[in-house]
Structures are given as C-alpha cells and as structure tokens.
Curated annotation (Swiss-Prot):
UniProt family annotation: Belongs to the uracil-DNA glycosylase (UDG) superfamily. UNG family.
Xref: Gene3D superfamilies: Uracil-DNA glycosylase-like domain (3.40.470.10)
Lineage: Bacteria, Pseudomonadati, Chlamydiota, Chlamydiia, Chlamydiales
Name of the featured protein: Uracil-DNA glycosylase
Organism: Chlamydia muridarum (strain MoPn / Nigg)
Pfam families for this protein: UDG
Keywords: Cytoplasm, DNA damage, DNA repair, Hydrolase
GO cellular component, one term: cytoplasm
C-alpha cells in the first residue's frame, strides 16, 4: 500500500521540491488513513493514478495550473487529473461547461473528456484533495492532502516564474492566497467555478483559453493545443 505513495513515484523534479513532505507528521497520518480506506471502502482514483497530475506534468515543465477540489466520486470517473475523465466516460457537468466555454472562446469542440494531452503540454491539473470515497464528495478532506497540495502550490509560486494560475471559484483562489500576498512573476486568471451553480456568474465568457495562449505567446512559449483528438 505505502509503495503507491512513495516519493519514488514522482518525477525527479517533483522529488527535489517535495522531499521534505514525506517526513512531515501529517504524511504518516495520511498514509495510515489511506491504508484503512483502500482496504475497507471503495476509493477513487486507483492508487496508481493518485499522483497522475505530478507524473504527467513535471515541476520544471509546468506552464499553467488549473486547480480542482476533490476527485469525481462516481465509478470510473477519477483518474488523477482535475476535471478530467477517462476516454469513454460521460462528461460531468463542470467539464461540459468547460468545453462549452472553450468552444465559444476558440471554436474548439471536444468530444472526449480525457485531458491527458493538456497535462502533457504543461497544464498541471491538480486537485486540492487527491482521493475520495465512492459516492461521498469531500470525504477525504481534512485528512492531510491539503498540506501536500499547499506545498506543491507554494513551491511553484516561490521556485518558478511566469506560470499562469487559473483560479476557477473561491476555493482555488483561497488555495493560491500566497499569490495575492507576495510579489511574484506569475499571471493570474480568476473567475467563478464552471459548475452548473456558478458558471453563469462569470465563467461563461471568461475566455481563459485564448488568454492563456496569448500570455504563453507573449512569453515566447509554445501555446496549448486545447483540441483533444
């Protein structure tokens, strides 16, 4: 069980940034909790997918950060990337709204909800909490994952420059509070969450996808191809 959550599961660049987390008290408590949960309940995503966001987008390759909250809690949906579902899965409401905004913004129409190609291009699709019990949203909140993902965000803010932080909703903004408290060389795009409850309050019409590519082009970096084949 613990082998699934060792530092060796991460790319070298993330290992160097996060090595101190494995010796923190919260980490051993989190591992004990996860061992019990995976043994006695159905937990998403599968253990081998929990660190998919970090494996897909190494620290030194992060160009954009899109923060989610906790994984989808339906069967077969969560695979370690925020907002993403495996190919063949129906689009959850928030992702459907994300794709609706993408089409309105750039005319790109996506049919499949697997965002792996975005991650491969430098978009870190990170949830605040990395696991969840089946059918119980936020069931693994407050168990330690927040400390771990806080460390990820802090390392990116402090040890990288010119990252585009995409903050959809108040939880993502709060997670990146350090961006609003310190001087830095990052860009911030913020608007309401794409969930059906909030999307009409300013997510639709935010044009974040074209703005991301405008900023990347300005930085001399390759733009993101948002089209999913």
């Amino acid at each position: 069980m613990h082998e699934a959550f060792t530092i060796e599961q991460l790319p070298q660049s993330w290992q160097e940034q996060l090595k101190d987390e494995w010796s923190q008290p919260y980490w051993s408590q989190l591992l004990t909790f996860l061992k019990s949960e995976y043994a006695n309940a159905t937990v998403y995503p599968k253990k081998e997918h929990v660190f998919s966001a970090l494996r897909s987008t190494p620290f030194d390759q992060v160009k954009v950060v899109i923060l989610g909250q906790d994984p989808y809690h339906g069967e077969g949906q969560a695979h370690g990337l925020s907002f993403s579902v495996p190919k063949g899965q129906a689009l959850p409401p928030s992702l459907r709204n994300i794709f609706q905004e993408l089409q309105a913004d750039l005319g790109i129409r996506n049919e499949t909800g697997c965002l792996q190609t975005w991650a491969d291009q430098g978009v870190l699709l990170l949830n605040t909490v990395l696991t969840v019990r089946a059918g119980e949203a936020f069931s693994h909140a407050g168990r330690g994952w927040e400390h771990f993902t806080d460390a990820i965000v802090t390392k990116l803010i402090q040890n990288r420059t010119h990252i585009i932080f995409v903050l959809w909703g108040s939880a993502a903004r709060k997670k990146c509070d350090l961006l609003f408290q310190t001087k830095h060389q990052h860009a911030i795009l913020a608007c309401p969450h794409p969930s059906p409850l909030a999307a009409h309050r300013g997510f639709f019409g935010c044009c974040h996808f074209s703005k991301i590519n405008y900023l990347l082009k300005k930085q001399g970096k390759p733009m993101i191809n948002w089209k999913i084949a």
